[in-house]
Amino acid sequence: MTWHHTSLSRLLKIEYPIVQAPMAGGITVPKLVSEVSEAGALGSVGAGYLTSVQLDQHIKEIKALTSRPFNVNLFVPEKEVSISKEDIQTMTGILKKMNMPVHDVSFTNETSYSNYEKQLEAVLLNDVPICSFTFGLPSIEAVRELKQAGRIVIGTATTVEEAILFEERGADVIVMQGSEAGGHRGTFNDSADACIGTMALVPQAADALCVPVIAAGGIADARGIAAALILGADGVQLGSVFIPCTESGAPAAYKAKILSSKEDETVLTRAFSGKYARGISNDFIQKMKPFENSILPYPVQNELTKRLRSHAAKELNAENMSLWAGQSLRLINESMSAKEVLDRLIAGVNDVTESSRKDVNASGS
């Protein structure tokens, strides 16, 4: 059996057990998602910040471009977010003193949950084959409805305990997100400080779970893929390598920072969204360090910085962008199409596994 014939590739009906990470915020546009799926991997829509109408349009565009499987990722809403007006005014004042554009907070728990419910409805109505979840457990009813409709459910976990909760909830696959991963930490079970790395997390999860495991975090080349499979993963999820792709919706300044940054330039920060996320350090993150205790919980902080991030993208100002990226940045130094990225990864894993096989045969002769 070759390396790409795994329980994950069979379950998801994909040729290679490689998942393009569902990066929210405009990166995973339909062209990128469809090109990844067309190349034999699994394209993913990061739908966390999309309205249900926008998601519906994305899904329809992807289906017009490919008949292959793809995934839609949803952010499970916070159970209860209670913030005083005084706290919001304090953070608003801090941002304004920095001459940062501030977005009026329109968030309520009710509107957040309502959009999430409508997103789920869009997934079901449009026959999306795979639905993944981040930031928490979907309801028992949501999982039941998806599975009764024949959809595959994927959970995101940062500890074995979180993964077990997802498996018990009915998830068919679990993404084990190591602390090296770019973007938001998928933590939801009071373990934000654990920061377990991919190499330590994957084998422990593989031993504890009955469902397939996807390794995520710091994987950016063929060696990382091969290592994850050896550690017990049934597949891998890569994000940062797809940000500079020609099909990616990331702003040019963001792509340039990915291609020019090093592994020691990423940090975990709450400055932009109120949740810990790994990204390339910039002026905004550094300016916010003295005000760490005033940063508001997600999604309120995320609402406040919405205009800042939008303005930075338009102005191509990387110093005020949320430049989410993982720790393997030295391995990403060339802009290619999604197909070229995947072709290189697949050929590389073929070479690595063939070389290992020859080494084993030679040592046994």
Spans of model-derived segments:
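Active-site entrance/lid segments in N-terminal catalytic domains of soluble metabolic enzymes
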Residues: 1-191, 195-208
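Conserved active-site-proximal phosphate/metal-binding subdomains
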Residues: 95, 184-190, 194-214, 219-365
